[in-house]
Design a protein with these regions (language model features):
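N-terminal secretory/membrane targeting signals
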Residues: 1-25
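Juxtamembrane and boundary regions of transmembrane helices in multi-pass small-molecule transporters
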Residues: 22-30, 66-70, 75-91, 243, ...
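Interfacial loop-to-helix junctions that mark the boundaries of transmembrane helices
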Residues: 54-65, 116-124, 145-159, 274-284, ...
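Membrane-interfacial loop-to-helix junctions in multi-pass transporters
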Residues: 61-65, 153-160, 186-199, 231-242, ...
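Hydrophobic mid-bilayer segments of alpha-helices in multi-pass membrane transport proteins
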Residues: 66-87, 122-139, 155-167, 219, ...
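Transmembrane helical segments that form the transport core of multi-pass membrane transport proteins
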Residues: 99-105, 140-152, 170-179, 200, ...
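Short helix-coil transition sites and intra-membrane helix breaks within transmembrane domains
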Residues: 168-179, 207-219, 252-260, 509-522, ...
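Hydrophobic transmembrane alpha-helices that form the pore/transport pathway of multi-pass ion
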Residues: 190, 194-254, 265-266, 521-539, ...
Length: 593
């Protein structure tokens, strides 16, 4: 008990120290700022020949470069092991659940290693987790102020934008609008599963050039989940579809100069406008998307045909539910049955209470009247508390309204019903506002706060506003940009030493292990880039954007929305394998056309 008191006292004084430090205004103004990370010019290696020699020189100049890259490598390896962590987490949870069922463990207990492995298996937390390790390394090698200056200087606009646009794009009005548009196109081809699959995989990515890639990814992934993944296709088809989606989204934003993050990073610097993007990238991307879709469709045509009956049955069920099942009458009948059960249950509670009270009050023979009255009063309160606690778990609907716990309808987001046009229009306005102000976080974040209020007011036409997936994706991207800012010391020399084809190939490969926007941004810092080299590095960056979850900013959004359809999450190795052929097709389109 003494040790516990000392620990509490220590935490209290630690909190006071932090408050005093904050109240003091932080670091002194005379603290000398360390240039971290060092500028490329500070290496003075222009006269050094050979990539190996340049990199060795930069490591000797700033040893922390190697540390930062080793931490980044560890984070990448962690992403490839995430499915293994989830496998053991699920296995241990199942074993612990059996112990609970057999009475060998308490119902409220949990197996801590399983929870830790589940946390480590969440791809969205990987880079944020390793950013903590990187931060500790910066503080150890330099100091606290260097760390603060670095993280304060990192541009978090893209992670913040993805959080906001993903929240808006996943709203019921936007999804209904997108579904209505795509259903009209799919209806031209009789509204079959094949028509829906091809429409989503073609139109969704191309829309990314106008509504931004993260929004296109969110809409496409949610529609694929509803129309395709719910049908439980084979493991091969699942991976082929998500890999193709990632590749298509990555190149689908190249019809314009403002929608794809890797293009946005260079467009202003190199004066690339909309006509330039469409004539040099856009039409080639469309050909690549159509070609890749056709190839995957032909490979899995037999399976799509076998899934058609299941798809038609699910569509028919939805139509029958909307037209013929009168849910209001059913709810009324169920409510009456609930009241009858509630009456019987209340009688049973009274019987239990009477028996327990008689047994408890036998102790009154040893107590005076005051103590006996107190015992009776305590029993009444304890019984009422236990009754409410038990009913909250088993039959919360039978409790009085003021005692009921807040519950959410698990099928609320799957309900039928249309959304008024004016609500759709307001949601489109929110998205347009966000896209127009993409460079101004204070403005588009304020717009999101306004949207949350609007969604609350119009709740009957909304799905549950679930901020967890967007926030996790934002955490992922935030961690990635913190790591990416310290990788330029080796990426820039590699990009600057290559000719067109090797540069495009290298950009594609590097993109698999670093965000493609970071790759293209670093290319703007390389002096003497010709127009053909500029084309090659951007083409390589967008081509490789589907190889891994970290390759393109919208990928974590798709991963977060679809991961539950894959056992133990999405395997990075299988994703890489199934994305290889579509990536080759896109690369050939950009290189040969």
């Amino acid at each position: 008990m003494k040790m516990y008191s000392k620990f509490i006292l220590f935490l209290f004084f630690l909190l006071l120290s932090a408050s005093a430090y904050a109240g003091g205004g932080g670091p002194d103004s005379h603290d000398v700022a360390v240039h971290f990370p060092p500028s490329f010019a500070s290496y003075h290696d222009a006269d050094i020949n050979g990539i190996g020699a340049i990199l060795r020189h930069r490591i000797s100049h700033t040893p922390f470069n190697l540390v930062a890259s080793l931490v980044f490598l560890a984070a990448i390896m962690h992403t490839f092991l995430s499915s293994k962590f989830l496998y053991y987490a699920h296995k241990w949870k199942a074993e612990h659940q059996k112990k609970i069922e057999t009475g060998c463990a308490s119902e409220s207990s949990t197996y801590l290693p399983a929870e830790i492995f589940h946390f480590l298996g969440e791809v969205e937390v990987v880079f944020g987790l390793w950013a903590v390790v990187l931060s500790a390394a910066v503080i150890f090698f330099y100091d606290w102020h260097t760390f603060v200056n670095y993280v304060s200087g990192v541009n978090y606009t893209e992670p913040m934008f993805v959080v906001v646009i993903m929240t808006l794009a996943s709203s019921r009005p936007i999804l209904k609008l997108s579904e209505n548009i795509m259903s009209r196109i799919a209806a031209v081809f009789k509204g079959t599963l094949a028509a829906w699959w091809l429409t989503i995989m073609t139109l969704g990515p191309i829309l990314g050039s106008f509504i931004t890639e993260p929004a296109a990814m969110t809409i496409s992934a949610m529609l694929l989940a509803e129309k395709f993944y719910e049908l439980k296709p084979s493991k091969k088809f699942k991976y082929a579809t998500i890999a193709l989606l990632f590749v298509n989204i990555s190149v689908g934003g190249t019809l314009t100069h403002f929608a794809a993050p890797p293009v946005l990073m260079v467009a202003a610097h190199w004066n690339w406008d909309l006509p330039f993007m469409f004539t040099n990238f856009g039409w080639k991307a469309v050909i690549g998307i159509l070609t890749s879709n056709a190839m995957v469709f032909l490979v899995f045509k037999k399976e799509i045909t076998s899934l058609e009956n299941i798809f038609k049955l699910s569509q028919l069920k939805n139509e029958i539910r909307e037209k013929y099942i009168h849910s209001d009458f059913l709810k009324k009948d169920l409510k009456m049955a609930e009241e009858r059960i509630g009456h019987d249950l209340q009688q049973e509670f009274t019987r239990i209470k009477t028996a327990a009270k008689e047994s408890t009050l036998t102790a009154c023979s040893c107590l005076d009247d005051g103590e006996c009255n107190l015992l009776e009063e305590t029993f009444e309160q304890e019984f009422e508390d236990l009754k409410i606690q038990q009913m909250s778990v088993s039959v919360p609907g039978l409790l009085p309204r003021d005692k009921r716990p807040k519950l959410s309808d698990p099928n609320w987001d799957k309900r039928c019903g249309n959304v008024p046009g004016w609500i759709m229009a307001v949601h489109v306005a929110f998205m347009v506002w966000t896209i127009i102000n993409v460079h101004y976080p204070a403005i588009f974040v304020s717009g999101m706060l306004f949207y949350i209020g609007f969604a609350h007011v119009t709740w009957p036409f909304q799905n549950t506003v679930n901020l967890k997936p967007p926030m996790l994706v934002g955490f992922f991207l935030g961690g990635l940009v913190i790591h990416g800012g310290l990788q330029g010391w080796w990426i820039a020399p590699v990009l600057g030493s290559l000719d067109e084809f090797p540069l495009m190939l290298s950009a594609t490969i590097l993109t698999a292990f670093n965000d493609n926007a970071a790759i293209t941004y670093l290319s703007t810092l390389v002096p003497g880039f010709t127009d053909s080299l500029k084309y090659a590095v951007v083409a390589g960056g967008v081509t490789g954007g589907g190889l891994t979850v970290i390759a393109n900013a919208p990928n974590p959004a798709g991963q977060a929305l679809l991961k539950n359809y894959f056992s133990n999450g999405i395997s990075p190795l299988l994703l890489l394998t199934y994305a290889f052929i579509p990536t080759m097709v896109m690369g050939l389109c950009f290189f040969l056309l």
